[in-house]
UniProtKB/Swiss-Prot annotation:
SMART domains: TOPRIM. InterPro entries: DNA_Rcmb_RecR, Rcmb_RecR, Rcmb_RecR_Znf, TOPRIM_dom, TOPRIM_RecR. Belongs to the RecR family. Residues 80-175 form the Toprim domain. PANTHER family: RECOMBINATION PROTEIN RECR. The keyword DNA repair applies. The lineage of its organism: Bacteria, Bacillati, Bacillota, Clostridia, Moorellales. One of its GO terms (molecular function) is DNA binding. This is Recombination protein RecR. May play a role in DNA repair. It seems to be involved in an RecBC-independent recombinational process of DNA repair. It may act with RecF and RecO. Keywords: DNA damage, DNA recombination, DNA repair, Metal-binding, Zinc, Zinc-finger. The gene is recR. GO terms for biological process: DNA recombination; DNA repair. It comes from Moorella thermoacetica (strain ATCC 39073 / JCM 9320). A zinc finger (C4-type) spans 57-72. PROSITE patterns: RECR (PS01300), TOPRIM (PS50880).
Length: 199
């Protein structure tokens, strides 16, 4: 079907977003054309501002608008415990449980040989650097319950145990192949309560 070039560009751009197929991209594009121009400008401005002002925390790798992030600079949090997650969005899911008061470390991915992602492409060196002063007593591995997440957890477990730090893994009542961001608060709270050392 023929669309004017600007509309085609918008549909194509929206279709590049995760979880947005061609039909949804089309619906979103048509919706954006119907809303008042001020709403479209507000959306465009919000996207640009988020891209310009959101950075990675130099300590944990979480998204932030200041460095270090609010979690890393909070004196009320337990600085002797680090919870390792794959993506920054996983922190939001875990924080909703209100069960964990330690710090985080975002790997920005998981080991996936099929995709050419090894430990070198993840923020493993930065994690090791955080452990060298001896203040961290426990590292909780909260990677996803899929093949890549399990591979990453096993790799980190083996690596971190040589440093003498306690390494635990979240107990999962989550389906294998599931992502943390989609889990409900009760399931995540139980997972924190039942975490265990890998054997």
């Amino acid at each position: 079907m023929y669309y004017p070039e600007p509309l085609n560009k918008l549909i194509t751009a929206l279709g590049r977003l995760p979880g947005i197929g061609p039909k949804t991209a089309q619906r979103l594009a048509f919706h954006l054309l119907k809303v008042p121009a001020s709403e479209a400008r507000d959306l465009a401005a919000a996207i640009l501002e988020a891209r310009q002002k959101t950075i990675y925390c130099s300590i944990c790798g979480n998204f932030t608008d200041r460095d270090p992030c609010r979690l890393c600079s909070d004196p009320e949090r337990d600085h002797s415990c680090i919870c390792v997650v794959e993506e920054a969005r996983d922190i939001i899911a875990l924080e909703k449980t209100r069960q964990y008061r330690g710090l985080y470390h975002v790997l920005q991915g998981a080991i996936s040989p099929v995709d050419g992602i090894g430990p070198e492409q993840l923020r493993v060196k930065e994690l090791l650097a955080r452990l060298h002063d001896g203040k961290v007593k426990e590292v909780i591995l909260a990677t996803n319950a899929d093949v890549e997440g399990e591979s990453t957890a096993l790799y980190l477990d083996k690596l971190l145990k040589t440093l003498g730090v306690k390494v635990t893994r979240l107990a999962y009542g989550l389906p294998v192949g599931g992502d943390l961001e989609y889990a409900d608060e009760v399931t995540l709270a139980r997972a924190f309560a039942g975490r265990h050392e890998l054997e």
